[in-house]
Amino acid sequence: IAIYLKDYLSDKELKTVNKYIKKMHKKFIKPEEFLEKEKGFYAMGNGGIPNLAYAHWTNNKKLAAKEFNFRFKNIEEVFYDDGYINNNSFRGFRALWYHSYGLNSALGYIYLAKNWGAKVPELVMNRITKAAEVLNLGITDYESFSSRKYDGKQKNNQYKKHNARKHTHQEALAIDT
């Protein structure tokens, strides 16, 4: 929200906010800003959106470019050619929810990339588009969606019938319409 107020801050206020933002970046974002995440795609563009917020505040186009390149590579790794998402799409009865969660986060990230003028790689767009098709499959034919087996190891999944609730992520507004 501070970015919307930046032009209206006095020099003293701007100095205070800058100091605060730099400290917060150093303490909370910097330690994890480019961690390799091999499984899934989750909140805040899988951790990339805080980098973009900081890059925007500091007008650091190099940081933004590095972030986009890093996160696009991450999307290429965890979004499969067939539209399923590593880890997200294979969480038992929670798979549809986690699939929509990852897809929604990636869609938001791509929207930000386009607003920055970044070129989104064709492979990323193809995999995101396919993931949207898989989400629609999960909504219309859950059995077909869940028939794809995961070739990795799962630690956090639910396969007990009483836990079944086929739904999309509550913050992925209108993703299922």
Segments and roles (model prediction):
Residues 1-117, 125:
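Aromatic-lined, polymer-binding surfaces characteristic
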Residues 120-177:
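CBM-like carbohydrate-recognition segments
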